């Protein structure tokens, strides 16, 4: 379930291309891209909203929660090898970091959810404060670095196509660092 929350930006209904110019689609007249072009985007009704989920996709916060559940419980499985457990946990760590990064690119500094809160958590525990830009980037990069250790160098098996490996993790890490080095965040004291 950790992979299920990866954004689906390839379909007609979720494509950013529909808001770029006069593109038309034969299937749908009112895609989210068209609604954004018409000015129907708002804080209370976001299109392409990763915070609360959109289309047939759940919220990235749900994805982070599922990743944390897997990481916390993978070592309770009795019929897996230690290597398999470590590899699956590393994939979940990477996906958790990637979901934090996607939220960061949309909303700036975000609350960091490294562990799930218990259902008995108090109101004060639930109200997690927003992190700074540096804290967000440091957390994402450190989580990716932690995941890389137990990821395979490269997945070449046809049964494992699309699974996270070191090449994918390092490429996303470079994107995170490049994004953080942009003038929007690097040295911009007015913004954050």
Q: Can you say where each PLM-predicted feature lies in the sequence?
A:
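Conserved, well-structured interaction surfaces
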Residues: 4-9, 30-107, 123-138, 142-161
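Acidic, serine/threonine/proline-rich low-complexity intrinsically disordered regions
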Residues: 116, 127-130, 184-192
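Short, conserved phosphate-binding/catalytic loop or strand-edge motifs used
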Residues: 113-121
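Short coil/turn linking the two alpha-helices of tandem helical-hairpin repeats
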Residues: 104-105, 111, 179-188
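Membrane-proximal, proline-rich intrinsically disordered regions
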Residues: 1-18
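Acidic helix-start/capping segments at beta-turn-to-alpha-helix junctions
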Residues: 18-25, 88
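Conserved catalytic breakage-reunion loop centered on the nucleophilic residue
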Residues: 170, 176-178, 192
């Amino acid at each position: 379930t950790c992979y299920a929350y990866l954004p689906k930006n390839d379909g007609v209904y979720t494509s950013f291309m529909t808001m770029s110019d006069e593109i038309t689609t034969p299937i749908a007249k009112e895609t989210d891209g068209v609604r954004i072009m018409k000015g129907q985007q708002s804080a209370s009704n976001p299109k392409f909203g990763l915070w609360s989920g959109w289309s047939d996709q759940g919220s990235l916060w749900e994805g982070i929660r599922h990743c944390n559940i897997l990481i916390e419980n993978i070592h309770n499985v009795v019929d897996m090898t230690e290597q398999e457990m470590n590899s699956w946990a590393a994939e979940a760590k990477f996906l958790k970091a990637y979901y934090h990064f996607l939220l960061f690119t949309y909303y700036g500094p975000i609350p960091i959810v490294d562990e799930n809160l218990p259902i008995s958590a108090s109101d004060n525990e639930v109200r997690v404060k927003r992190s700074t830009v540096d804290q967000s980037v440091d957390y994402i990069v450190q989580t990716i670095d932690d995941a890389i250790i137990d990821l395979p160098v490269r997945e070449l098996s046809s049964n494992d196509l699309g699974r996270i490996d070191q090449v994918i993790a390092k490429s996303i890490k470079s994107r995170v660092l490049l994004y953080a080095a942009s003038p929007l965040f690097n040295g911009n004291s007015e913004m954050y």
